[in-house]
Amino acid sequence: MPKIIELPEVLANQIAAGEVVERPASVVKELVENAIDAGSTQITIEVEESGLSKIQITDNGEGMAQADVAMSLRRHATSKIKNQGDLFRIRTLGFRGEALPSIASISHLTIVTAADGEVYGTKLVAKGGEIESQDPISTPVGTKITVENLFYNTPARLKYMKSLQAELAHIVDVVNRLSLAHPEVAFTLLNDGRQLTQTSGTGDLRQAIAGIYGLTTAKKMVEISNSDLDFEVSGYVSLPELTRANRNYITILINGRYIKNFLLNRAIFDGYGSKLMVGRFPIAVIDIQIDPYLADVNVHPTKQEVRISKEKELMALIKSAIAQSLREQDLIPDALENLAKSSTRGATRSVQTSLPLKQTNLYYDSSRNDFFVTPETVQEDIKPLVSKSESSVSSVANKQQPTVKQAKRSADDSDSEHGKLDYKNKSKLKRMLENLTNEETSTFPELEFFGQMHGTYLFAQGQGGLYIIDQHAAQERVKYEYYREKIGVVDSSLQQLLVPYLFEFSGSDYISLQEKMPLLNQVCIYLEPYGNNTFILREHPIWMKEEEIESAVYEMCDMLLLTNEVSVKTYRAELAIMMSCKRSIKANHALDDYSARDLLVQLAQCKNPYNCPHGRPVLVNFTKSDMEKMFRRIQENHTSLRDLGKY
């Protein structure tokens, strides 16, 4: 008796549903994408109990002919592709012919549809993938699909559904992404009769952003645009002052399809450089138009993973588009808005009975204000990246040394905020180190210093109004740019080690490093296999001080394993960040007028005077208009959606 049998179609569909239909939001995604492919301009999504009880999608698309309705429930039945060649020219959102039969196999499904030119429409009812009835019906052109009792015959899947609020949040996210991908379609989302999302369908992406994220957010979005022979990149990104705590507000679209791509996310962060605070993420909608031949969407049934040819070229295009648009903006945050966002509810009002004034000293005391960036002060921090002197070498040689030395990973720096970074946690490093080297010179307002508060903040005025400067962040930026230039120079010479070092790795890392060893050789690190999962280092590059060999080699290897790249500049930039932070003036340090003015002059000469190396703002701005609003001299005007075109 044969052991291998062909599974019944309903069972096969239920198995496929395990990948295609993960939760109610998956049903919404697949059915709305079908509606978009049908040419709909209005789509209404109605759900009950976060989609577990009922999901209904109504559109005004081309509908289905009577003969096609039953066929749509057959596996791999589709109108999107006809032959193998079409698989490489996919411009529709759906093409596999799996979604509708998979959904039907785990729910009670009703389809009401009519095609243009048909006398009657069709109503089809199916339960568990089996068609129970199909009748003619009078209905307008378009399609209405109702999915009820989702997962009724797969209790294991139903058991592990999250809370109703969590499932609803996934549905809202799906509809929001599709609304941003297709601003020409008017979307309406209702849950238990309550409207959650509505977009106008005008085709204006900024209007769609306003409908989803709000008018205030839309006003702080910057348009980007760039193209080459293969790609067209457009969309909007938020100003650096408008960020979120996670990546969920980044939407990347390829030919109208929302995708997830780590490298393209990285290109967005690279475009911002050091303008983002560590741990903060921008709001972005990046629309990429690409020849279908360069994108393989047939990777996963959910079609959210796409393989892209010429991915590095696309990353460079996105990065330059964002960087160019931000260079054209005034990046000094509006202080009045920051105050409104950071105000504390229920804060007690302080009563001030007097306004004591302190006369500012008009002299310069170098002993009090050791903060000027000079070659001498830099030399104190940056030790020559050269070999030891002959005397030190001879003294080491006279001591008894083992034939090899076991390298150890260095302990974490005691300064948790500004200590050494872990290359295995690269999210901070990518934004805080690699991007710092790509900054370009920015225009900076001409400021006139006039005071200091609490030994921490400097006050200056300019044509733009009142400016408040964080003196520590300002000097940190000044010193960082100076240090970066000094330690960015790399000497590729090698020096023999008197005692070689052994570096031990896990089995998988050891194999990966053997394959990627040519990349380490490019930065003059030559590791040789030496026993089980161990490498030996017999010589080190001049740019690497001997006391940092162990930590530097391990960090460079960690960088290579995680990013497939290795960069001396990135590693040395970390040192520049640490030195600039530790050598900068701290809070509660009074500056005399000469020192404060000179700090502002040096800040104005920086390539990026707006943020410290960690991404914190250096200064904020109160405009004359802001001051007049605070003192009720003028009333704030409220902007409507129709005014968005002015920004």
From Swiss-Prot:
GO terms for biological process: mismatch repair. The keyword Magnesium does not apply. Keywords: DNA damage, DNA repair. GO terms for cellular component: mismatch repair complex. PANTHER family: DNA MISMATCH REPAIR PROTEIN MLH, PMS, MUTL, DNA MISMATCH REPAIR PROTEIN MLH1. This protein is involved in the repair of mismatches in DNA. It is required for dam-dependent methyl-directed DNA mismatch repair. May act as a 'molecular matchmaker', a protein that promotes the formation of a stable complex between two or more DNA-binding proteins in an ATP-dependent manner without itself being part of a final effector complex. This is DNA mismatch repair protein MutL. It comes from Streptococcus thermophilus (strain ATCC BAA-491 / LMD-9). The gene is mutL.
